[in-house]
């Protein structure tokens, strides 16, 4: 067999086993763990290449042939960092491995047949990840959705009804009528969507009615009163209907302290938002909750990574988002109680330790909806620069850290909200919500986004040009965004109760409608690469944080990767 140099191989087929790739301008280096393709039998589209009739393409149609094949993709996922062809059929991932023509090639997987009906997308040299999942959405403006989508987020979970004050402050779509309106509005968008109902209710029939109306879970928020009674009854109904509860705890400790909230939770699973506390929660020690086995702890992106500007920008954000008045002394004291540099500094290291498990945005309510992915990788890079390689790493790479951080916005939020059977990773059988990245732009600007197996967004040049690449090149909606395609390629998530009762038919929904499940039988140990439990303590006077008796903190960064190098403003 004729051999070519490794450099020539990479330029033609992308990196293979043992090759290392830098992510953006970070210090994070991945190493390809294995290559599922067969050397000498790689498939590639183009002039003089192999995807041709009688070569890598079979000439007879079959029920097994793919709709789309991504060739020689470098997959970065919680399942591994490896090279493979990805086959898509009927909107789902049909196979991952070696694609081609079994009649002519060795090692072709049975479910990766390239045939007359197969489109080809050249992924050699590109990184493929699962679409991001943002679980902390204030649905204040619909313009958030395309902004998030362009960043690589393909699923948004939260609540709201538009720019009402309740929505500006809390991620809640309250009541049957509002849920109906939001479920119908969801039809318009290239984005998977799920809505959280109001959990601040101690009368259980009112809670049940919202789940039966299509909510995928509850949000308990202090602005509506995060009392032990509300927490207890909300979790009762969540257990009954198998839905998740997200909570923003009681900053002012009006109805109890963090210990009282944990007592009301009583060991039941709950998803804590902005668990550090600057976004809200028991002052000064809500961060303690992150170490508990039944807590699924998340960060929102205004506090990660910790920089020299973090503290200063939070005051103004807080006053606006929670309808506070700088002329009222008590409102200013409320804001001051939430912004603690010491706990923010600890948050970065708690992510690196795998104690904090999920990242999200808090969109237009202190967080930036288009920066979940970027800020996750900035945090990973900042931590590597400050603390060095993780002890779990093997070889001259950062693969363990990369898997830890990609899990925070893909598989872990999917597990937390009962949608991991459908989305959240690059695995066979899941919906093909995939993001393609050039390594140089990884984490900051995707090349292309495939939604439900069809291209929905891409960087694209002048439509009047003779080729697709002349300037101006920017994100443009593709055919997956238009017409009835968006009904087949996007999911509206609802409760099992609403799904079984026929909510799709009742509301006349055209989109794919699927039920959430397995929300109540999980603990932190089910979260990938971020399952560490620990005893966390906060000094009530200095706000310093200790984990199992050892102080944890980090420095405020002066400069970040994935920042001004890639952006005009």
Swiss-Prot record:
<dbReference type="Pfam" id="PF00449">
    <property type="entry name" value="Urease_alpha"/>
</dbReference>
<dbReference type="GO" id="GO:0009039">
    <property type="term" value="F:urease activity"/>
</dbReference>
<feature type="domain" description="Urease">
    <location>
        <begin position="131"/>
        <end position="569"/>
    </location>
</feature>
<protein>
    <recommendedName>
        <fullName>Urease subunit beta</fullName>
        <ecNumber>3.5.1.5</ecNumber>
    </recommendedName>
</protein>
<comment type="similarity">
    <text>Belongs to the metallo-dependent hydrolases superfamily. Urease alpha subunit family.</text>
</comment>
<keyword id="KW-0378">Hydrolase</keyword>
<dbReference type="InterPro" id="IPR011612">
    <property type="entry name" value="Urease_alpha_N_dom"/>
</dbReference>
<dbReference type="Pfam" id="PF01979">
    <property type="entry name" value="Amidohydro_1"/>
</dbReference>
<keyword id="KW-0533">Nickel</keyword>
<feature type="binding site">
    <location>
        <position position="362"/>
    </location>
    <ligand>
        <name>Ni(2+) 1</name>
    </ligand>
</feature>
<keyword id="KW-0479">Metal-binding</keyword>
<feature type="binding site">
    <location>
        <position position="221"/>
    </location>
    <ligand>
        <name>substrate</name>
    </ligand>
</feature>
<dbReference type="InterPro" id="IPR006680">
    <property type="entry name" value="Amidohydro-rel"/>
</dbReference>
<feature type="binding site">
    <location>
        <position position="136"/>
    </location>
    <ligand>
        <name>Ni(2+) 1</name>
    </ligand>
</feature>
<dbReference type="InterPro" id="IPR005848">
    <property type="entry name" value="Urease_asu"/>
</dbReference>
<keyword id="KW-0963">Cytoplasm</keyword>
<dbReference type="InterPro" id="IPR032466">
    <property type="entry name" value="Metal_Hydrolase"/>
</dbReference>
<dbReference type="GO" id="GO:0043419">
    <property type="term" value="P:urea catabolic process"/>
</dbReference>
<dbReference type="InterPro" id="IPR011059">
    <property type="entry name" value="Metal-dep_hydrolase_composite"/>
</dbReference>
<dbReference type="InterPro" id="IPR029754">
    <property type="entry name" value="Urease_Ni-bd"/>
</dbReference>
<feature type="binding site">
    <location>
        <position position="248"/>
    </location>
    <ligand>
        <name>Ni(2+) 2</name>
    </ligand>
</feature>
<feature type="binding site" description="via carbamate group">
    <location>
        <position position="219"/>
    </location>
    <ligand>
        <name>Ni(2+) 1</name>
    </ligand>
</feature>
<comment type="subunit">
    <text>Heterohexamer of 3 UreA (alpha) and 3 UreB (beta) subunits.</text>
</comment>
<feature type="modified residue" description="N6-carboxylysine">
    <location>
        <position position="219"/>
    </location>
</feature>
<comment type="pathway">
    <text>Nitrogen metabolism; urea degradation; CO(2) and NH(3) from urea (urease route): step 1/1.</text>
</comment>
<feature type="binding site" description="via carbamate group">
    <location>
        <position position="219"/>
    </location>
    <ligand>
        <name>Ni(2+) 2</name>
    </ligand>
</feature>
<dbReference type="GO" id="GO:0016151">
    <property type="term" value="F:nickel cation binding"/>
</dbReference>
<dbReference type="GO" id="GO:0005737">
    <property type="term" value="C:cytoplasm"/>
</dbReference>
<dbReference type="InterPro" id="IPR050112">
    <property type="entry name" value="Urease_alpha_subunit"/>
</dbReference>
<feature type="binding site">
    <location>
        <position position="274"/>
    </location>
    <ligand>
        <name>Ni(2+) 2</name>
    </ligand>
</feature>
<feature type="active site" description="Proton donor">
    <location>
        <position position="322"/>
    </location>
</feature>
<dbReference type="InterPro" id="IPR017950">
    <property type="entry name" value="Urease_AS"/>
</dbReference>
<dbReference type="InterPro" id="IPR017951">
    <property type="entry name" value="Urease_asu_c"/>
</dbReference>
<feature type="binding site">
    <location>
        <position position="138"/>
    </location>
    <ligand>
        <name>Ni(2+) 1</name>
    </ligand>
</feature>
């Amino acid at each position: 067999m004729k051999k070519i140099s490794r450099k020539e191989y990479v330029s033609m087929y992308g990196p293979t086993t043992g090759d290392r790739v830098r992510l953006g301008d970070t210090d994070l280096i991945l190493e390809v763990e294995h290559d599922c393709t067969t050397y000498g039998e790689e498939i590639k589209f183009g002039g003089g290449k192999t995807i041709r009739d009688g070569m890598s393409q079979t000439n007879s149609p079959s029920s097994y042939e793919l709709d789309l094949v991504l060739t020689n993709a470098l997959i970065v996922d919680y399942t591994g960092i490896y090279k493979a062809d990805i086959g898509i059929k009927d909107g789902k991932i049909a196979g991952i491995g070696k694609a081609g023509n079994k009649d002519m090639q060795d090692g072709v997987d049975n479910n990766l047949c390239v045939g007359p009906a197969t489109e080809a997308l050249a992924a050699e040299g590109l990184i493929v990840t699962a679409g991001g999942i943002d679980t902390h959405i204030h649905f204040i403006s619909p313009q958030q959705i395309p902004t998030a989508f362009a960043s690589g987020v393909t699923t948004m979970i939260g609540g709201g009804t538009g720019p009402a004050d309740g929505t500006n402050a809390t991620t809640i779509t309250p009541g049957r009528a509002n849920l109906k309106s939001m479920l119908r509005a969801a039809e318009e968008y290239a984005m998977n969507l799920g809505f959280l109902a109001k959990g601040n209710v101690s009368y259980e029939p009112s809670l049940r009615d919202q789940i039966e109306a299509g909510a995928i879970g509850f949000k308990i928020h202090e602005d509506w009163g995060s009392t032990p009674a509300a927490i207890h009854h909300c979790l009762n109904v969540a257990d009954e209907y198998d839905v998740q509860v997200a909570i923003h705890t009681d900053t002012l400790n009006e109805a109890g302290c963090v210990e009282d909230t944990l007592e009301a939770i009583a060991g039941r699973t709950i998803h804590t938002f902005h668990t550090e506390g600057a976004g809200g929660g028991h002052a000064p020690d809500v961060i303690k909750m992150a170490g508990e086995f039944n807590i699924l702890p998340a960060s929102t992106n205004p506090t990660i990574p910790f920089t020299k500007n973090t503290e200063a920008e939070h005051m103004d954000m807080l006053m606006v988002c929670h309808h506070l008045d700088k002329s009222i002394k008590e409102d200013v004291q409320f804001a001051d109680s939430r912004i603690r540099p010491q706990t923010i500094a600890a948050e970065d290291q708690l992510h690196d330790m795998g104690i904090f498990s999920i990242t999200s945005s808090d969109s237009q309510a202190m967080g930036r909806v288009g920066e979940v992915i970027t800020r996750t990788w900035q945090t990973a890079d900042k931590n590597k620069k400050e603390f060095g390689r993780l002890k779990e790493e093997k070889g001259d790479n950062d693969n363990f850290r990369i898997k830890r951080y990609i899990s925070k916005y893909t598989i872990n939020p999917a597990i937390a909200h009962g949608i991991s059977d459908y989305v959240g990773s690059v695995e066979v059988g899941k919906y093909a919500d995939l993001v393609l990245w050039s390594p140089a732009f990884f984490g900051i600007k995707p090349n292309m986004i495939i939604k439900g197996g069809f291209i929905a967004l891409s960087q694209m040049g002048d439509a009047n040009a003779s080729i697709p690449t002349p300037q101006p090149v920017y994100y443009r909606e593709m055919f997956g965004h238009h017409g009835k395609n968006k009904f087949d390629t996007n999911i509206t998530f609802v409760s099992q109760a609403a799904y079984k009762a026929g909510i799709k038919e009742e509301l006349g929904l055209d989109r794919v409608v699927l039920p959430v499940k397995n929300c109540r039988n999980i603990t932190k140990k089910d979260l990938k690469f971020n399952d560490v439990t620990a005893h966390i303590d906060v000094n009530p006077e200095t706000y310093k944080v200790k984990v199992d008796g050892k102080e944890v903190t980090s420095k405020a960064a002066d400069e970040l990767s994935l920042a001004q190098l890639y952006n005009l403003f």
